[in-house]
């Protein structure tokens, strides 16, 4: 049967809107509304440049996948570009490329997101394409077979052949013994090898519903211009039932876990991960902000304790970093990654003891006013500079909304960071830097014996 393609009236949206922008101000007007079918919409005005980003966030990711079906959400992301009622396979990307619209998509633990950055008068194109993809994707078996081979090749390139990624995947599976966060977003290879198009269609029908999505628009637009477009293209989609997401809760203290890996790398590497709450699970958001600052204080900047003493001072490590991502629906990890200096002869066990000395020091010796203010200034500057790009603004807005936290909390984040005290840092270290919460990976040089 022939498929009619390119039925969209794209030319109608090549004419610019008139009187789009209002004078820019320091405060960014942000609007929200919900369509009758359940689609939530957040619009933030930013009139500094005549561009806009449109992001459609679905509350479905790798954490929602049952055992044996890892990688479903990421595979579905790929397949949404393989044709729908108005589009042939690959035509969405072709349309965007022809119009100079930057576009892509990504899958994470809790979300799948499709986004475009474009001129304001092109928003109708973005909305029509996204609305069609989210409601009438074909998901044919004959399209899935070659695309699955592409996904498997992507996994080999980005995971199996990447020693850093492989080590991180092993650590994640160890660090999340009770929740689905331990599975890789792209999926385990043995699950990919038995995945089929019928599973994708079931996943699509159960998860891709207006009520399970948030549309985020940031840029040179106004609510008066955007809302009619949203209603025109997304408002006609029928409401449909969908599977509610479940928070991926982890055991608070699963017990100490350790793994030893052997890889052909230049120097031994130490990975540590502590089970901690996220913004979606913390009982007190002050804890989240304390952990965020603690990451900067530990090994998140060149003035942090680990880098200043062990990397630059004693030259024990050649590279160190600590990370804490609070933007999850389920529980998170506080991680430390340290690579031994090539001239060092001490073991990773000894290196880990040195790290523990600094971790325990935070419990008895909280940061002084100057140390804390320096870290706070660095972190706040990073947050404020991140607002320069409309894509980054939309990404954080969508992340907050998709984990069940209002975008207003994002706007208040800087104020909350200013309230964190040295005692908050000390309490966070005492609570979460424990061996009962720890997973460790020792990555040794050489082949597996």
Question: What is the predicted role of each segment?
Answer:
Residues 1-5:
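N-terminal secretory signal peptides that target proteins for export/translocation
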Residues 7-19:
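Bacterial N-terminal signal peptides
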Residues 18-43, 222-262, 275, 308, ...:
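Proteolytic maturation boundary segments
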Residues 44, 49-65, 71-75, 89-133, ...:
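M16 family metallopeptidases and their MPP-like homologs
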Residues 70-84:
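Active-site SXXK
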Residues 82-86, 134-142, 364-367:
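Short, polar/flexible loop-turn hinges at active-site or ligand-entry regions and domain interfaces
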Residues 148, 197-233, 437-438:
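Non-catalytic, conformational "gating/processing" segments within enzyme and secreted inhibitor domains
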Residues 173, 242-303:
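His/Glu-based metal-binding/catalytic segments typifying zinc-dependent metallopeptidases
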């Amino acid at each position: 049967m022939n498929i009619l393609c390119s039925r969209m009236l794209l030319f109608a949206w090549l004419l610019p809107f008139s009187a789009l922008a209002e004078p820019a101000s320091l405060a960014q007007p942000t609007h929200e509304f919900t369509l009758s079918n359940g689609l939530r919409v957040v619009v933030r005005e930013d009139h500094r440049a005549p561009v806009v980003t449109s992001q459609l966030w679905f509350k479905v990711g790798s954490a929602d996948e049952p055992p044996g079906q890892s990688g479903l959400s990421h595979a579905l992301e790929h397949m949404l570009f393989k044709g729908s009622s108005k589009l042939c396979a690959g035509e969405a990307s072709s349309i965007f490329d022809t119009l100079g619209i930057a576009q892509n998509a990504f899958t994470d633990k809790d979300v799948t997101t499709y986004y475009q950055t474009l001129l304001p008068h092109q928003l109708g194109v973005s909305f029509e394409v996204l609305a069609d993809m989210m409601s009438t994707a074909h998901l044919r078996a004959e399209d899935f077979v070659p695309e699955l081979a592409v996904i498997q090749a992507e996994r080999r390139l980005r995971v199996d052949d990447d020693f850093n990624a492989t080590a991180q995947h092993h650590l994640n599976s160890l660090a999340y013994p009770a929740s689905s966060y331990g599975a890789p977003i792209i999926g385990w290879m043995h699950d990919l090898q038995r995945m089929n198009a019928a599973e994708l269609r079931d996943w699509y029908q159960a998860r891709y519903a207006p009520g399970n999505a948030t549309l985020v628009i940031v840029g040179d637009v106004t609510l008066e211009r955007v809302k009619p477009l949203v209603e025109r293209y997304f408002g006609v989609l029928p409401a449909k039932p969908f599977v509610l997401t479940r928070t991926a809760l982890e055991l608070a203290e699963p017990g100490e876990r350790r793994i030893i890996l052997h890889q052909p790398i230049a120097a031994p590497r130490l990975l540590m991960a502590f089970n901690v709450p996220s913004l979606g699970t913390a009982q007190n958001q002050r804890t989240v902000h304390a952990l965020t600052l603690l990451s900067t204080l530990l090994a998140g900047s060149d003035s942090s304790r680990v880098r200043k003493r062990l990397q630059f001072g004693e030259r024990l490590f050649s590279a160190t970093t600590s990370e804490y991502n609070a933007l999850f629906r389920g529980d998170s990890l506080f991680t430390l990654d340290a690579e031994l200096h090539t001239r060092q002869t001490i073991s990773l066990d000894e290196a880990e003891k040195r790290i523990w000395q600094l971790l325990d020091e935070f419990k008895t010796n909280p940061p002084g006013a100057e140390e804390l203010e320096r870290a706070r200034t660095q972190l706040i500057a990073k947050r404020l500079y991140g607002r320069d790009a409309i894509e980054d603004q939309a990404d954080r807005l969508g992340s907050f909304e998709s984990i069940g936290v209002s975008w207003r909390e994002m706007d208040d984040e800087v104020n909350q960071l200013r309230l964190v005290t040295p005692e908050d840092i000390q309490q966070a270290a005492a609570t979460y830097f424990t061996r009962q919460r720890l997973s460790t990976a020792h990555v040794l040089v050489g082949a597996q014996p």
